[in-house]
From Swiss-Prot:
The inclusion bodies are the site of viral DNA synthesis, virion assembly and accumulation in the infected cell. This is Transactivator/viroplasmin protein. The keyword Metal-binding does not apply. Residues 476-487 have a biased composition (Polar residues). It comes from Figwort mosaic virus (strain DxS) (FMV).
Length: 512
């Protein structure tokens, strides 16, 4: 319904313009007809008046309407003679002979080219001016209103927005309004300004309703990153998926590595992945969640890290921006990870210690060899404890004398890089918090079997360590008569001390 009203309004506007054009054409035709008729009638009248009467033979009288006589009377006493080049005084207006009479007669000189011919443009100037004036009057009579306003120099200014939303005829008022960042438009008639304002208000109040729903491509593209973020937020891995990625690392050969842009670092206990540019992002992220990713050489656009947590990707981008040599150079991401753990339906994330820096040369794909598959729950517990010990050793290397900067830190991941200055106090606090999460067995995200094995290793490194697993072992030893052996294993931690009284023997970690 709204579209029909708009079309009818446009139809009325076009009809008005068509009528104005027709009126112009009619005015021009009428003026041309009037010009032609008046010119013919005026010429006949002048020709009739300029022909002298033929007197009877022997009765020649001077004709006062003669062109020569009339012209001499108007011009005055002197006239330049073109034949003699001298001025002669006019004494008598009467021609001296028939010879002069014939020369001055318009009948004898019918061509109308003689200077004394009354049909000369000089003589017809007055009548022509009268005809032109009549033509202009006819045109003004049939001219539309907006053309009359244009000829008079009148303008209408339309203001579309603001409190002064109307049309004006004075530019001074419109100029003051335009200083307030309001737009205006100039028209030659009031009708055009009114139509323009009405159409503008209609477009604002009634938005365009398309016959078919328009599907925007940008909405579909904007939905994809949200989908990626939701999936990437799931950092845990199922046991079946872990077993597949574990077997892939042990059984992959050179052909698989070249095709999928990775190679494996094989040892007796496990195999880890090293990914190069253009590796499959999902495979890289799966290996990271499984704790089997060792080194990543990402592309300049970091497409391999598309499924990683947002905080890790943002920290790597900031590192490339702030480090001058890393803007265009290749970088490496070296990862020390533990193995995830599963207890019935509960899944625990692995711990990660990440180092980033500038890669010296591009990595070539070395040959990967097929290893013997050794997959069991007991072997996984052993590998998990060894990987936690490796992360703990990397954290102990950071102290006040080292030049390390912490780029990212969370409950299960810490990212560091080399720095030109000494490690700051804030970074040391972050390292201490992350290390306390590993040492505090009660807060460690893993199963009981892993906690018991990890407690045994922590007691070797931190002499003042005391946890519930230490107390359980001490209680069982006291009942069996092995109190002395328990005291040797924990010489600085008496069994009477509560768990709250434990303190880390790590001087470089500030108090938190």
């Amino acid at each position: 319904m709204e579209e029909l009203k708009a079309l009818r309004l446009k139809e009325k506007i076009l009809e008005i313009e068509l009528n104005s054009v027709k009126m112009q054409i009619h005015a021009y035709e009428e003026s041309l007809k009037a010009t032609t008729v008046n010119s013919v009638q005026e010429g006949e009248i002048l020709q009739t008046e300029s022909i002298p009467e033929c007197p009877a033979q022997g009765k020649e009288t001077p004709n006062p309407v003669k062109a020569d006589s009339l012209l001499k009377t108007i011009l005055g006493n002197e006239r330049q003679n073109p034949l003699e080049g001298k001025s002669s005084k006019l004494v008598n207006l009467t021609p001296k002979s028939d010879k002069d009479k014939v020369k001055s007669s318009p009948v004898a000189n019918g061509s109308g080219k003689d200077s004394t011919n009354p049909l000369n443009p000089v003589a017809l100037g007055k009548s022509k001016m009268t005809i032109l004036g009549q033509k202009q009057a006819d045109e003004e009579e049939f001219k539309p209103d907006y053309l009359r306003a244009a000829s008079n120099g009148q303008s209408w200014f339309a203001v579309y927005k603001g409190p002064n939303k109307e049309f004006f005829t004075e530019w001074e008022i419109v100029a003051d309004i335009c200083k307030k960042r309001q737009k205006s438009k100039r028209f030659r008639s009031k009708e055009q300004a009114e139509v323009s304002i009405s159409l503008y208000n209609k477009d604002i109040q009634d938005p365009v309703n398309f016959l078919r729903p328009v599907k925007l491509v940008k909405e579909e593209r904007a939905a994809q990153p949200l989908k990626f973020k939701a999936i990437a937020a799931e950092q845990t891995i199922q046991f079946d998926e872990f077993r597949q990625i574990w077997e892939k690392s042990r059984l992959s050969d050179l052909e698989d590595g070249v095709q999928e842009k990775f190679y494996t670092n094989d040892s007796a206990s496990k195999s880890t992945y090293t990914f190069v540019e253009n590796a499959e992002p999902y495979l890289v992220h799966t290996a990271f969640r499984a704790g089997l990713a060792k080194v990543i050489y990402p592309s300049p656009n970091l497409q391999e890290l598309k499924w990683f947590p947002e905080g890790i990707v943002k920290a790597i981008k900031n590192f490339r921006k702030k480090v001058l040599n890393a803007k265009d150079a290749a970088i490496f991401i070296k990862i020390f990870s533990s193995i995830p753990d599963w207890v019935q339906s509960t899944r625990y994330e692995p711990y990660h210690f990440i180092q980033i820096g500038i890669a010296k040369t591009k990595k070539e794909l070395p040959s990967s060899k097929v290893c013997k598959e050794e997959f069991s729950v007991q072997s996984l517990n052993k590998v998990r404890v060894q990987s936690l010990q490796t992360i703990s050793q990397k954290l102990q290397e950071i102290n006040e004398e080292s030049s390390i900067k912490v780029n990212y830190c969370s409950s299960t991941c810490i990212m560091v890089s080399k720095f030109q200055k000494k490690t700051s106090t804030e970074d040391l606090k972050l390292v201490g918090i992350f290390e306390s999460n590993l040492v505090n067995i009660e807060q460690l995200a893993c199963g009981d079997q892993t906690k018991k094995e990890w407690c045994r290793i922590v007691r070797r490194t931190y002499q003042k360590h005391l946890c519930l697993y230490c107390k359980d072992k001490a209680d069982s030893s006291s009942t069996s008569g092995e109190q002395n052996n328990v005291e040797k294993s924990c010489p600085d931690s008496p069994l009477t001390n509560a768990y709250d009284e434990r303190s880390d023997d790590h001087k470089r970690i500030p108090s938190i």
